Structure formats: C-alpha cells, structure tokens
Amino acid sequence: IVNPDGAKVINGGGLILIPGIIEAHTHIAVPIPKNKINETDQAYITALSLKVAKGILMRGWTTIRDMGGPSQGIAKAIDDGHAVGPRIYPSAKFISQTSGHGDFRDYNEDHPSMGAISNYYQKQSSIIADGPAEVLRAVRESLRLGASQIKVMAGGGISSDYDPIDSVQYTKEEMRAAVTAAEQWNTYVAVHAYTDDAVRNALEAGVKVIEHGHLINKDTLRLIKRKKAYLSTQ
C-alpha cells in the first residue's frame, strides 16, 4: 500500500481496522433501571449517560440511533465538543397512551392531565398523550426538543407494569396523527411493537419503522415489505 502524501500513519499493533459501527436501538439517557429513575438525581443520571456514551464510542460504535429518553442534550454536548461519544440521533420523549408501555407512573399517581406532576415525567423521559390532538402536540413537543425521529409505543412490553404484552396501543387515527406531524417535519415514526396486531395497526397508519417485532409471523413480515417499512429487531 502506497501512503498518499500527508497521510497520518497509525501503528495498529497487528489489530484489525474496521469502519465505525452503527447501533440501531439504544436508550443512552436511561442508564439505570426505570424503577430507579424516580429516586435518582437527574444530574447523576446525565453523568452516567455521558460515561456510557464515551464507552460506546471507545468500543467502536460511531453512530447510535437513540429510541427514547432525553438524549438530545447529550447529543448536543457531543456535537459541540464538550463530551466524548458517538453521533446520536435522538428521539427525545417516548410517546405513550395512558396505561401504555411508556406510562411509568407509580400505581397511585394521578394522570398528568388531572394536574399531577410525576417525577418520572419531569425527567423528560416520556409523555402520555391520548387522542389525535394530544398525539399531535406530543410529537411536536419532541421535535421541538430536537428529535431526529419520533418514538411511539404501539404495543405492550416487558418493562411496563400495567399493559399486557399482547395489547395494541393507539388507534389508527391517533397513530396517523403522529405520522402526519412527523412527515410535516420531514422525518418518520418508529414504534415499539412485538405482536402481529400491534405491528399491523402501526403499518396501516403509515409508520415507517418497527422496533422489536419478535412475535410476528411471515405474513406480517411480508406486509412490512409491501409497505416499504423497516424492521429493527433489537
């Protein structure tokens, strides 16, 4: 190999050089279990997130797609040269229906629309929105905060306490509202969904990316292809 003039030669010590790796699904701003979020100072959580960001870069991941949580500030700190980490595409707040996969209130906490101020939601991790109008507002709020794409909870999950994993979350009308608001910003909606019904409901509303999808069948996979959508299986 002939080195071009002015090229910087780095002694790799016999190691293999590869291009930077892209991580398709992370939650870098949620570095501790969700049940610890409420009782942990936000500055401490951010410090842990910055440590995680540096570790990700040092292990070879140069770009990450962050799929929910207040990572937009971490992304800006890295972009502005104040912290070390990968390029981050943030989703900002998870968007969830009441009793959806992103409704992490304690059992006896009142609903935010009833005047309650949840400690979890003060930390900007997620937002509860019901009905097309509230969903539109929630998407626009995440975009205002700096989201590159929008993350909506479209079905049940493992880490949430009050929704069955086989539940379908959001009506098509609500999901279409999210898609419309995202498309007006020249971006897209990605959804958390495991099951056929949840994935199909999202696809029919115009969602472009399915996150997880571990319980879907071949017919649903074919529908993803027909809709020219994408499946991120992490």
Q: Can you say where each PLM-predicted feature lies in the sequence?
A:
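Metal-cofactor-binding active-site regions of metalloenzymes
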Residues: 30-33, 84-125
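Active-site mouth loops of central-metabolism enzymes
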Residues: 34-47, 114-137, 188-190
